[in-house]
């Protein structure tokens, strides 16, 4: 084999460039919400798994929370079932909840675990029901009627997070596992709930006081009025952009999860373009990142 010194030098430069970021995040907890195109494109699936293994290998503690809405939709369609949505939230009756649990806690979760392990990691799959990891309650939702009056909407077994059993996750991390969590929760009566994966990721980051929360999406990040990605926002600026309509629609719940996490002590949260190969590494190991960072300290984008 002939050694190409130019290629070797480039590799060495890349590795040394990453060194300050590795030092910054070593022994830190990173919560990554995995969803969108990154879960349906084989090349992106592979790059995500390798990214997670690399983070663990260099001394960080990644925790993965995954979605799986499209996979649930596909199985419901195969079974001839229809599932309504209200403001993006799936109406989940008991039989639909059984299917959701089977897909998220079964095939999707184990597929991610297997892929991470294939690339040299040691992942372990969980749902919020395991060891009462995610204590949930029924999500109460209101919708404004034609008369302008708020009316309650029953979404069925759709939940909100009450608490996260951080001891379980910390025990797994201490044993060198990579936790992979399906967004299901359980209430005190043993009822199972389907919970938004962004919300679960945000609450896991909050209860564990993670260094960073990363939400992988199918968009570039928060767009300004000029259509360009806003690379950094403070919580106060986010409030202003929601108020003036710059941040609107489906982005609001996602940005609210990130905002709540930062206001609860998570150092930074970032909306990441999961369609970019190795987006997780690019966000952690470069100043520019691949999305919109939300933090009280925007110098994190320039150090």
UniProtKB/Swiss-Prot annotation:
The catalytic activity, as recorded, is:
N-acetyl-L-glutamate + ATP = N-acetyl-L-glutamyl 5-phosphate + ADP
- Where is this gene product found? Cytoplasm
Tell me, what is an example of a GO biological process annotation in this record? arginine biosynthetic process via ornithine
Signal peptide per UniProt: none
Q: Does the keyword Nucleotide-binding apply?
A: yes
Q: Where does substrate bind?
A: 68-69, 90, 194
Show which residues form the site (Transition state stabilizer).
33, 254
Superkingdom classification of source: Bacteria
Q: Quick one: a GO cellular component term? A: cytoplasm
EC number of the protein? 2.7.2.8
Keyword annotations for this protein, in alphabetical order, are: Amino-acid biosynthesis, Arginine biosynthesis, ATP-binding, Cytoplasm, Kinase, Nucleotide-binding, Transferase
Q: What is its main location?
A: cytoplasm
CDD domains in alphabetical order: AAK_NAGK-C
Tell me one GO molecular function of this protein.
acetylglutamate kinase activity
Pathway annotation = Amino-acid biosynthesis; L-arginine biosynthesis; N(2)-acetyl-L-ornithine from L-glutamate: step 2/4
Against InterPro entries, the record matches this protein to:
AceGlu_kinase-like_sf (IPR036393), AcgluKinase_fam (IPR004662), ArgB (IPR037528), Asp/Glu/Uridylate_kinase (IPR001048), Glu/AcGlu_kinase (IPR001057), NAGK-C (IPR041727)
Q: Which SUPFAM superfamilies match?
A: Carbamate kinase-like
NCBIfam families tied to this protein: argB
Q: Which family does the record assign?
A: Belongs to the acetylglutamate kinase family. ArgB subfamily.
Q: What does this protein do?
A: Catalyzes the ATP-dependent phosphorylation of N-acetyl-L-glutamate.
Q: Which PANTHER family match?
A: N-ACETYLGLUTAMATE SYNTHASE, N-ACETYLGLUTAMATE SYNTHASE, MITOCHONDRIAL
**Under which name does UniProt file this protein?**
Acetylglutamate kinase
Q: Give the gene symbol.
A: argB
């Amino acid at each position: 084999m002939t050694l190409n010194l130019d290629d070797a030098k480039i590799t060495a430069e890349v590795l040394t460039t990453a060194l300050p970021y590795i030092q910054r995040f070593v022994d830190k907890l990173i919560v990554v919400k995995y969803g969108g195109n990154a879960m349906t494109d084989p090349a992106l699936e592979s790059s995500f798994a390798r990214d997670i293994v690399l983070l663990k290998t260099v001394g960080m503690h990644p925790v993965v929370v995954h979605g799986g809405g499209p996979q649930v939709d596909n199985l419901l369609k195969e079974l001839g079932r229809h599932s309504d949505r209200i403001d993006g939230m799936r109406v989940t009756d008991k039989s639909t909840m059984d299917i959701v649990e089977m897909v998220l806690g079964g095939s999707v979760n184990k597929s991610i675990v297997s892929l991470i392990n294939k690339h040299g990691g040691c992942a372990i799959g969980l749902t919020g029901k395991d060891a009462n990891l995610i204590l949930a309650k029924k999500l109460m939702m209101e919708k404004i009627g034609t008369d302008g009056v708020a009316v309650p909407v029953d979404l069925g077994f759709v939940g909100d997070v009450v608490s996260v059993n951080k001891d379980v996750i910390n025990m797994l991390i201490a044993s060198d596992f990579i936790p992979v969590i399906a967004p299901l929760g359980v209430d005190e009566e043993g009822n199972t709930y389907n919970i938004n994966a962004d919300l679960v990721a945000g609450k896991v980051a909050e209860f564990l006081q993670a260094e960073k929360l990363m939400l992988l999406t199918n968009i570039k990040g928060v767009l300004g009025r000029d259509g360009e990605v806003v690379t950094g926002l403070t919580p106060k600026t986010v409030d202003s952009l929601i108020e003036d309509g710059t941040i609107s629609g489906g982005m609001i719940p996602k940005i609210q999860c990130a905002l709540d996490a930062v206001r609860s002590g998570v150092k930074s949260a970032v909306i990441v373009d999961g369609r970019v190969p190795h987006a997780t590494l690019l966000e952690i190991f470069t100043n520019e990142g691949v999305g919109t960072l939300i933090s009280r300290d925007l110098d994190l984008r320039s150090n």
